[in-house]
Regions:
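Conserved acetyl-CoA-binding loop-helix of GNAT-fold acetyltransferases
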Residues: 103, 109-122, 149
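Flexible, active-site-proximal loop/turn residues at the rims of small-molecule/cofactor binding pockets
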Residues: 80, 107, 138
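C-terminal "cap" of GNAT-fold acetyltransferases
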Residues: 12, 25-29, 92-93, 130-133, ...
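Conserved amphipathic alpha-helical interaction elements at protein-protein interfaces in regulatory
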Residues: 29, 109, 122-126, 153
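Conserved GNAT acetyl-CoA-binding A-motif
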Residues: 117, 124-135
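Acetyl-CoA-dependent GNAT
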Residues: 10-17, 21-100, 104, 117-119, ...
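Extreme N-terminal starter segment of soluble prokaryotic enzymes
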Residues: 4-7
Length: 174
């Protein structure tokens, strides 16, 4: 997928570290989101986000600027069995999911988060799946609004607690 300024594609192995560092930067700056000293294992997972690609049907997408900067990333799961979050999401059948969407703070407002999200939706349709499952938190208010505008609907059956953090589930029927 392509925008006027960014191309969305699979990350190359040599880009995994950059994508992970971007995720750490973005998530650690979210007001109301746990910091690294509160959830060190979560931040370790972010740093090592490329490890997800070793799982079947799992892809790391990046938004690449014309100058080669990685300005966004997201992990796509073509099989919810490998989604790896809390709650019941891993039991969803005929569904895709995505997690860990992050956009460079210097490029926010340019539609990169939407491009990455739409790319995941298109990928789920290519795989002939019936729904896309995601999670977000209250700290991610901008993403929450974007997901709703794209047609995602709250699904309380997917909610869970990540230590002390409430995590809210959403579905998009395809």
């Amino acid at each position: 997928m392509k925008s006027e300024l960014h191309i969305i594609r699979n990350a190359k192995p040599e880009e995994y570290g950059t994508a992970g560092q971007l995720m750490v930067q973005v998530y650690s700056q979210l007001e109301g989101f746990p910091k690294e000293d509160e959830q060190p294992s979560y931040y370790s997972m972010l740093r090592n986000v490329g490890d997800f690609t070793a799982k079947p049907d799992t892809e790391l997408f990046v938004a690449v600027s014309p100058t080669g900067n990685i300005d966004g990333s997201v992990v796509f799961f073509g099989n919810m069995q490998y989604y790896g979050s809390g709650g019941t999401a891993i039991q969803e059948k005929n569904a895709a999911g995505f997690r860990l969407l992050a956009v460079n703070p210097n490029t926010r407002g340019a539609g990169i988060g939407k491009l990455l999200t739409v790319h995941c939706i298109i990928r789920a349709k290519e795989l002939k799946l019936q729904q896309v499952v995601i999670h977000t938190t209250k700290a991610m208010a901008v993403a929450w609004k974007m997901y709703e505008k794209l047609g995602f609907r709250r699904s309380e059956d997917l909610d869970f607690m990540q230590e002390k953090l409430p995590v809210f589930g959403f579905r998009l029927k395809l």
